[in-house]
Amino acid sequence: MYLDNISAENRAKVNHQYRINSLNFLHTLRKDELLKENGSEFQLHFDESENSFRDSISAVKNGVDIKNLGQGEKVLLGVENAYSHLKETVKILLIEEPENHLSFQNLQKLVNMLSSNTGVQVFIGTHSNMIASRLGVDNLHFLDNGQISKLEGLNRDTIRFFQKSTNQNLLNFTLGKKIILVEGNAEYILMEKFFEMIHSKKPEDLNVSIISVDGLSFERYLEIAACFVDKKVVVITDNDSDYVGNVQSKYSSYQQFQNIKVSSDLDNDNQTFEICIYKNNKALLDSSGLTKSKDLQGYMLREKAEFALRLLEHLETDNISKKFIIPNYIKEAIEWIIKD
């Protein structure tokens, strides 16, 4: 910061003045007999070099020395300083994982800072969903085993979606090799347990990631999946009483991709995840005591996440998992995702 804010001429003047002041200070100590060297052949000496001066100065923010600031504040200060004092000779700026030690709000400040036009080529290495999405998915380059890949030909609306969306799953999705996409909290809460019941292993043990997205966002993720032939993605979705319109026709453009599958119940009467669960396990669930409500299916539809949590607890603590029937469309999706 010091070197970026001082001219060469003034820098020389500062160095000269620092040497004079150092010598005068040492002379004063001896004159006032505050420093007694007792006739030793060695005498105390100040290091009046520029490095010594630079080591002795610091910066202050709101009255607090930067040495006492948190690591997050130091990251912001470092990036801000780098951006504010780019010289004409600088052509490339490299920033490695600037998100380290940052709170959510400071990460937002960082994203706004990085979005500014610097006039130079900026490379940012990151594992942050927010940085990757807010700076534009079309600007991303993925490094994997020495190979570089880029998302080409994305719809402009898809780019804007990830820049503005509150959902921060972009890197989780793009870096995963086998992805199960589900609609909401209820499906997300139960899907890992269903996977474990089918494969006797947790998803992460088989390199599978489960990501919850808004059902209206599936196509945004599938557009990215279509760019990666080595990434398997299965969507588990409701038919909402119209399998042909809401599933078959809606996702017909992705049928050509061998790495993409959309799975839903074919029966229009089984319009939601909760109804499929209930119809496959009516007697078991009615006798489970999961709720005092006499209308269990109605409760499942009203309190989706709460019911999912209660069911998960029963599946993990009781023996009902051996009797529990996972709907076929979910079972098929979970089996498909690990096939080579």
Per-segment meaning from a language model:
Residues 1-69, 74, 81-89:
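Extended helical coiled-coil dimerization/tether regions that scaffold
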Residues 3-4, 36-39, 67, 85, ...:
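Short N-terminal helix-initiation segments at or just after the protein's N-terminus
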Residues 9-20, 101, 122, 212, ...:
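Generic amphipathic alpha-helical segments used as scaffolds and interaction surfaces in large
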Residues 14-17, 21, 71, 99-102, ...:
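Catalytic cores of large soluble enzymes that bind and process phosphate-bearing ligands
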Residues 26-31, 111, 192-196:
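Generic solvent-exposed, charged/amphipathic alpha-helical segments
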Residues 40-42, 91, 204-208:
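Residue-level recognition of the N-termini of beta-strands and the immediately preceding loop/turn
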Residues 53-171, 188-192, 335-339:
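Switch/communication elements of ASCE P-loop NTPase nucleotide-binding domains
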Residues 132, 137, 141-340:
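Acidic, divalent-metal-binding catalytic cores of TOPRIM
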